[in-house]
Amino acid sequence: MDRTPVTHTATDRTLGHFPSGRDVSVTVHRYEGGPGPTVFVQAAQHGIELNGPAALRRLHARLVDAEIAGTVVAVPVANPLAFDHRSYLTPEAYDAFNSNFNRIWPGDGDGSFQERLVANIWPLVEAADAAIDLHTGMPEMLEHVRFR
């Protein structure tokens, strides 16, 4: 695979709308190099997990001037509702049935508020050859990695 200089784009992806009509959106970064696989990486499904967005900021600093084969698609804050409320779960005022963003993949375009939000991120995951979901544990947790 040939590595080529990265072309970086950042776009807002609308996931849904508040009852007021305001958009709920996430920022999607694309780092496109030469031909090759696509990797999707996201962070902050839980709003108090801050290490993932920080790690993606560091990754951005390395990728923006790099030469790579393939594409990296990054969503630093997958759940802006929980993130903006500094809450592990999405506040129940938004979705009393599905407050844990991480438990409702791949979402449902006709489902609850959060299921609809997740359903609008899912195409990015589906289009990738590999997907990485970054989480942060509490200090007393044992370190672990899960993969499928």
Where are these regions (language model features)?
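Structured catalytic-domain cores with a bias toward divalent-metal coordination
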Residues: 1-148
